[in-house]
Structures are given as structure tokens and as C-alpha cells.
Amino acid sequence: MTSLQERLFAMQDKQYAAFQAKLTPGVPMESFIGIRVPVLRKFAKEFTKEEECEEFLHQLPHQYYDENMLHGLLISEVKDYEECIRLTDSFLPFVDNWAVCDIMSPKVFAKHKEELLAKIKTWSKSSHVYTCRFGIETLMSHYLDKDFKAEYLEIPASVRSEEYYVKMMVAWFFATALAKQWDATIPYIEQNRLAPWTHNKTIQKAIESYRITPEQKEHLRTLKIK
């Protein structure tokens, strides 16, 4: 066991490990140490200041799920954009579950929207489930507000995948887009631009959202594919 692993096990909550394993199918139970996210997040902020951090970021693959979660949190703190992209591209092939994928949210991305868009297009075309999911999620996080352009909706709309965690992310993206950019997004639903399962899941998630008006929800209900 490495010295870092010893420190991680010192934060272990075995009940939480069992809970996390149920939420993350496909990841072996023995991979979970069981560290609560707020605890791991606090540790990550301190660990970034240590010399061992850089070494850890280049030691792939990791043995434990919690090490991958830590890796994602550490990447999110990297301040240099080019280095952050390098580390993200190195790590994504090793991401094997939605939780690790979704915890990655690099702060530096917000300052590099133009360069980031090219990376998003590449990630979204990947055949690797969680690289594709990360690309769509990053688009959703950074380009549905003041940096929005209607043409960006084509990126997730063109994704064709039978992978559950990709389809769910596309649905999540379009439900969020309906809430934030209704006029540009609703034609994608009205014209059946998405695969049937994703189309209906988008409508379901949008109807569940408090950001969608009652009138909009009523219209969406008429667009379900039966």
C-alpha cells in the first residue's frame, strides 16, 4: 500500500463504500475505499500543494475508485489550461464510471472557451463512453448561457450511441438546453432530431424541471414518441 493509499484509508467509511458501489454498477466492490465526496474534496485542495500530487497524476491506472475520484478533483484544480487539457486527455481513457466522469469540472475551462470548443467536439465524437459523456457535459456546463450559439446543439444531436451513460447525458443536455435556450432547442424535439429513447428521456427530464414553464411542459407532453 502506498503512503497516499494509507492516508485515503484513514478517511474510510465502509457504509458509504457499500452505498457508492450500489450507485456505480460495473465497478468491483473491492475498488471502493468509501470516502465521502466533501471529505475527499477538502483533501484534494490540500494535496495539490504537495510534491506527491504531480507524481500521483502521472501514475495511471489507479487501484481504487476513490483514487480516480481524487484524480478528477485534482485535475479540476489545475490552473494552467494546456496542462489541464494534457492531464484530462491522459486520464479520460481510464475513467470507467459516471461518478468519476461527472466530478471532473476544471475551473480553468471557463477562461478558454474558444480553444475548449475544439476539444469538446473531439471528446464528443469518441467511442469511449466516458470521454464522449465528458465532452457533452462540458458543453452543457459552459455553453448554454452567455456563450451559447444555436449551432452548438448539433454537437450532442449528432452523437449516436447505444451506451446508457451517453444517452442519459444527451438527454440531460437537451433538457437543460430547453430550460435555458428554449426557442433554439425546441425544434430538435419537434422535428424528432434525437433517437426515440433519448427524445422521450429529454422530455421526461424537462417536465421534471422547475425551470420549464407549465405551458412549455404541456407542449412537450404532446411531443412524446409513443
Where are these regions (language model features)?
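Alpha-helical scaffold domains
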Residues: 1-226
